[in-house]
Amino acid sequence: MGGHPQLRLVKALLLLGLNPVSASLQDQHCESLSLASNISGLQCNASVDLIGTCWPRSPAGQLVVRPCPAFFYGVRYNTTNNGYRECLANGSWAARVNYSECQEILNEEKKSKVHYHVAVIINYLGHCISLVALLVAFVLFLRLRSIRCLRNIIHWNLISAFILRNATWFVVQLTMSPEVHQSNVGWCRLVTAAYNYFHVTNFFWMFGEGCYLHTAIVLTYSTDRLRKWMFICIGWGVPFPIIVAWAIGKLYYDNEKCWFGKRPGVYTDYIYQGPMILVLLINFIFLFNIVRILMTKLRASTTSETIQYRKAVKATLVLLPLLGITYMLFFVNPGEDEVSRVVFIYFNSFLESFQGFFVSVFYCFLNSEVRSAIRKRWHRWQDKHSIRARVARAMSIPTSPTRVSFHSIKQSTAV
């Protein structure tokens, strides 16, 4: 209601004409509520104000609290807030009732809609930026064959999984109308299954990243023993039977609304959410061990203590998004507080939509091998296309015996 929450109520009171019959019934109801109260001494009698709020019999000198009206003059109000009225020392009610806390639910719904639309914009913007960054990173890994080691192949597959997930996200957003949801046609269920499959592959490729780092840093095994097919089985293979089992469960127990959401008491979604949470927990253990080893190695070095901690913090900040620990935030319940829910909605929307962008930055754009390979290619391209290179090549060509040079013509003319 803005800065004057009583303004609408006051305007309504000026135009209000209560039906005598309904007012009488309200008085009787209010009086019946007060019968149970046993008050001695000076008191205010039960009363119904012009808004319809019942103020029960109360002792003199007391501030009485009553819920805000649920519905008044065509406007719904939040009944979790309260109105206040004082029972004066002389046993009469104060003329003024404090309804300053009573807020229109209409305004709250408008605020919720605004926050929802902003969150939708953040989601679309984040997924667009992420998809562009992921495609650029994918092309770089495709073109730069000189850096194709197992570590970068894992990065490449993770980026591919994120591309497919982002692409199916756009398919879901653009095709899943309310009518399609209700019809529950076969293709929309396949789209949902594909989206969930690529979502799970993101987690398992992050698990592959964690396995590789843990093997290389903590277990100190030679990474030459690791094979590409092992990680392909983990990243692309393991999620497939998980999603098949989930789809069968949905088909038999929750076959509605294109398999989005879930009915109360049906827990088929945990078939794929459970393994995702499990690999997150394992990655958390990997992260703890990796940071512990990094701290030990840094402490054993000759650098100062400040530099040691700085490197440890940098390593931690890099490893957090790499191992997917940020997804832990998506399982947090923000509670009923409005501020917490708004912050959670924005924070969740930002993290989920920009996750692909962060992966591209950490795995590709900040990758020293990728940057070095790009720099070499750029220098080769400059050498090939620069004027200096063309002149140098022309000067290096030997003069043919049958070709007369400009210098020899000049000398013969002088003679």
From Swiss-Prot:
| Entry annotated with the keyword Protein transport | no
In this chain, the stretch annotated as Important for antagonist binding covers: 280-290
- Region feature Important for peptide agonist binding, mapped onto this chain: 99-108
Q: Please give the CDD domains that the UniProt record associates with this protein.
A: 7tmB1_CRF-R1 (cd15445)
- Pfam family, any one: 7tm_2
**Which one of the record's GO molecular function terms can you name?**
corticotropin-releasing hormone receptor activity
Keyword Signal included in the entry's annotation = yes
Q: Which residues lie on this side of the membrane: Cytoplasmic?
A: 143-149, 219-225, 296-306, 369-415
In the record, the effect of F203A is given as: Nearly abolishes antagonist binding
Q: In which tissues is it expressed?
A: Predominantly expressed in the cerebellum, pituitary, cerebral cortex and olfactory lobe.
How is the protein altered post-translationally, as described in the entry?
C-terminal Ser or Thr residues may be phosphorylated.
Q: Which residues, if any, are the signal sequence?
A: 1-23
Q: How does it sit in the membrane?
A: Multi-pass membrane protein
Q: What is its main location?
A: membrane
Outcome of mutating F284A? Slightly reduces antagonist binding
Changing M206A: what effect? Strongly reduces antagonist binding
Please describe what this protein does: G-protein coupled receptor for CRH (corticotropin-releasing factor) and UCN (urocortin). Has high affinity for CRH and UCN. Ligand binding causes a conformation change that triggers signaling via guanine nucleotide-binding proteins (G proteins) and down-stream effectors, such as adenylate cyclase. Promotes the activation of adenylate cyclase, leading to increased intracellular cAMP levels. Inhibits the activity of the calcium channel CACNA1H. Required for normal embryonic development of the adrenal gland and for normal hormonal responses to stress.
Q: How does it assemble?
A: Heterodimer; heterodimerizes with GPER1. Interacts (via N-terminal extracellular domain) with CRH and UCN. Interacts with DLG1; this inhibits endocytosis of CRHR1 after agonist binding.
Any idea what this protein is called?
Answer: Corticotropin-releasing factor receptor 1
Species this chain originates from: Homo sapiens
Provide the organism lineage as a comma list. Answer: Eukaryota, Metazoa, Chordata, Craniata, Vertebrata
